[in-house]
């Protein structure tokens, strides 16, 4: 019995091997995007060049001509295969005057926001006590948002704001609370019950955000 107990950690280690990243056992593992993603990331490309480790997609401003007047340009594993297995990714955030990134979460990564232009008001809410931490950020300032916590950013200035964002995972995921509640086909009667909003308010928000039901 004692011997069996001692063998358990070894057996568990072997079971977990398929879910560990190849980048942990070799220098890197540039994603082969022609293959399917797995819990351990994408399989490695057979042939790799210097271009796999550089990405130029964040040089141009995103299109902020939309409802929230903001745009996120990602450099996740799907756009930048070189980050596969490294536990990192990046993005560019553009927020026009009056723009906002509504309350949202990244279920698979923490976020580090670095403001390069303009003024950004930002904050997050803790999961247990609902404590709110807010800050107004200027060019050169940074703020961290812990993984999975609700947070927001909005332009608090009179000119366009730009920020570079780093994530602690190759594909951080995104769920915007407003869209999750009102841009779907969940029946309005249920939304009313779970949000304490009345029928008119729910239908208005569903109409604005493209929901149905």
From Swiss-Prot:
Gene3D superfamilies: Jelly Rolls (2.60.120.10). It comes from Oryza sativa subsp. japonica. This is Germin-like protein 8-14. Residues 1-23 form the signal peptide. Disulfide bonds join 29-44. The gene is GER5. InterPro entries: Cupin_1, Germin, Germin_Mn-BS, RmlC-like_jellyroll, RmlC_Cupin_sf. It comes from the Eukaryota. It holds the Pfam family Cupin_1. Its main location: secreted. May play a role in plant defense. Probably has no oxalate oxidase activity even if the active site is conserved. Oligomer (believed to be a pentamer but probably hexamer). Keywords: Apoplast, Disulfide bond, Glycoprotein, Manganese, Metal-binding, Phosphoprotein, Secreted, Signal. Residues 56-203 form the Cupin type-1 domain. One of its GO terms (molecular function) is manganese ion binding. GO terms for cellular component: apoplast; extracellular matrix. Belongs to the germin family. It is found in: Secreted, Extracellular space, Apoplast. Glycans are attached at residue 63.
